[in-house]
């Protein structure tokens, strides 16, 4: 017997002794295992800190985590944080990317002038549905300005920049693609960085509302200082939640990634530069719904209490929220109809109404129309007892016509009644006024 056999035999004996001495059992406990979701991606981050309404639902095989989509869907559900080069316009850059990627649609998060460089969020295919929401997000610029005359002290420049904050009147510059009418735009902060008296040039950082013209701010700065001024260079270093330090890519990256995908079948470069659309929604309050109601929401259904699994704190009525699946996919952007405290305390009602559906229809299976009444209605349509739209015809049994209530018909009748009441209201008021006049005239006589 060799050394190896002895060793294995000894290990076996030790294992047997340990099994006899120890009690290998899972003790019963009321404590639930702690789940650390702080490192989970995108919308699933801090999932364990969401308020739980219920954990009972049937998981569906359909759907997939945003980071595990196949490459075709990954690209069509993604966006770039592009470093726009100086000279080409935003529309030119977007059309070039459309041609490189051979996709159906592209959009961007807000136009940059041809000479301006920096952050430009380029949305691809399905992500273009979020382009409008990103256009309204806040922007941050770094600007180089030039004054036409010398200024005694750079503190005056700093004070003038501080005056140009808050709500400002602006008229678009002469070279602009919009109507030149007076408008109000909010500048949140103008941070003075540097001023060179020899060249009469300075740098400042501007955090402002979308649609603000930094060129106009430079002109106003010159007017306040009494010497005139103009913008020399401009770079956008933040657009919405994307800034220049976070996954910024160039046009060369896009071209190289597509080349690697076409020739080498290498997806890694493309997955590195393209980010899932869910990354644009990480600042929204979240509501997680059951898999069974996902497709209904894609077809325009309202989000009701029975379909809710988890929800965020501090949800306010009328604010935008994101409706998501248990796998972390964004279904739609919705307008909240209930606050967090209301959701926690009620057992029925409308939580939110969808504003913009993001997910395609029929990704998840249909789970409505499976009840006894709906099944009976489908059978009657097959048998010819109802027309193809499910409405009564000559052959429809009288019992069905009495029992079945068409909600759209009832709603229409209610709307007609309300319209009639609105029309009759001024007539009633005029009659009452006429009666009062008659009674007052009789009293005077």
Curated annotation (Swiss-Prot):
Which residue intervals define the domain PUA in the entry? 284-359
UniProt entry keywords in alphabetical sequence = Coiled coil, Isomerase, Nucleus, Ribonucleoprotein, Ribosome biogenesis, RNA-binding, rRNA processing
Comp. bias regions, Polar residues = 20-32
Q: Report the Pfam families cross-referenced here.
A: DKCLD, PUA, TruB_C_2, TruB_N
Catalytically driven reaction(s)? a uridine in RNA = a pseudouridine in RNA
EC code: 5.4.99.-
Q: Which family does it belong to?
A: Belongs to the pseudouridine synthase TruB family.
UniProt record, GO biological process: box H/ACA sno(s)RNA 3'-end processing; mRNA pseudouridine synthesis; rRNA pseudouridine synthesis; snRNA pseudouridine synthesis
**Localization in the cell:** Nucleus, Nucleolus
> Whom does it interact with, and what assembly results?
Component of the small nucleolar ribonucleoprotein particle containing H/ACA-type snoRNAs (H/ACA snoRNPs).
The lineage's top-level taxon is: Eukaryota
In the UniProt record, the signal sequence range is none
Q: What is this protein called?
A: Putative H/ACA ribonucleoprotein complex subunit 4
List, from the UniProt record, the residues annotated as the active site of this protein: 113
Q: What sort of enzyme, by top EC class, is this?
A: isomerase
Isomerase as UniProt keyword: yes
Q: Which InterPro entries match?
A: Dyskerin-like, PsdUridine_synth_cat_dom_sf, PsdUridine_synth_N, PUA, PUA-like_sf, PUA_sf, tRNA_PsdUridine_synth_B_fam, TruB_C
Residue span of region Disordered: 1-32, 407-445
Q: Which GO terms describe its cellular component?
A: box H/ACA snoRNP complex
Question: Which species is this UniProt entry from?
Answer: Caenorhabditis briggsae
What does the record give under GO molecular function? pseudouridine synthase activity; RNA binding
- Describe its function: Plays a central role in ribosomal RNA processing. Probable catalytic subunit of H/ACA small nucleolar ribonucleoprotein (H/ACA snoRNP) complex, which catalyzes pseudouridylation of rRNA. This involves the isomerization of uridine such that the ribose is subsequently attached to C5, instead of the normal N1. Pseudouridine ('psi') residues may serve to stabilize the conformation of rRNAs.
């Amino acid at each position: 017997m060799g050394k190896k056999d002895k060793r294995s035999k000894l290990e076996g004996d030790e294992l047997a002794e340990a099994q006899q001495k120890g009690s290998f059992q899972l003790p019963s406990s009321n404590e639930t295992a702690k789940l650390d979701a702080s490192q989970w991606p995108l919308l699933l981050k801090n999932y364990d800190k969401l308020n739980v309404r219920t954990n009972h639902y049937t998981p569906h095989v359909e759907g997939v985590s945003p980071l595990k989509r196949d490459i075709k869907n990954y690209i069509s559900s993604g966006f770039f944080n592009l470093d726009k080069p100086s000279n080409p316009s935003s529309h030119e850059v977007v059309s070039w990317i459309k041609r490189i990627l051979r996709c159906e649609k592209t959009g961007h998060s807000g136009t940059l002038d041809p000479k301006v460089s920096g952050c430009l969020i380029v949305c691809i295919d399905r992500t273009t549905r979020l382009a409008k929401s990103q256009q309204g997000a806040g922007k941050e610029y770094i600007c180089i300005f030039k004054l036409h005359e010398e200024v005694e002290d750079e503190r005056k420049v700093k004070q003038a920049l501080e005056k140009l904050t808050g709500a400002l009147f602006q008229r678009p510059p002469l070279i602009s693609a919009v109507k030149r009418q007076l408008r109000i735009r909010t500048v949140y902060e103008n941070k003075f960085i540097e001023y060179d008296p020899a060249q009469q040039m300075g740098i400042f950082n501007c955090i402002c509302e979308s649609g603000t013209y930094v060129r106009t701010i430079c002109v106003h700065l010159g007017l306040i200082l009494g010497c005139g001024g103009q913008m020399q260079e401009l770079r956008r270093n933040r657009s919405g939640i994307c800034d220049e330090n976070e996954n910024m890519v160039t046009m060369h990256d896009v071209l190289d990634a597509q080349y690697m995908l076409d020739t080498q079948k290498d997806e890694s470069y493309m997955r590195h530069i393209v980010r899932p659309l869910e990354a644009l929604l990480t600042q929204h309050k979240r509501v997680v719904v059951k898999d069974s109601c996902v497709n209904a929401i894609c077809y325009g259904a309202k989000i009701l209490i029975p379909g809710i699994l988890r929800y965020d704190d501090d949800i306010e009525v009328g604010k935008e929220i994101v409706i998501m699946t248990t796998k972390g996919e964004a279904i739609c952007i919705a307008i909240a109809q209930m606050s967090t405290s209301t959701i926690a305390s009620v057992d029925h009602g409308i939580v939110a109404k969808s504003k913009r559906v993001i997910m395609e229809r029929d990704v998840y299976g249909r789970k409505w129309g499976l009840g006894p009444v709906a099944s009976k209605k489908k059978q009657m349509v097959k048998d010819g007892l109802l027309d193809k739209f499910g409405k009564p015809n000559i052959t429809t049994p009288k019992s069905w016509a009495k029992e079945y209530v068409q909600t759209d018909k009832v709603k229409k009748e209610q709307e007609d009644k309300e319209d009639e009441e609105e029309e009759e209201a001024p007539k009633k008021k005029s009659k009452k006024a006429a009666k009062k006049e008659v009674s007052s005239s009789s009293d005077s006589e």
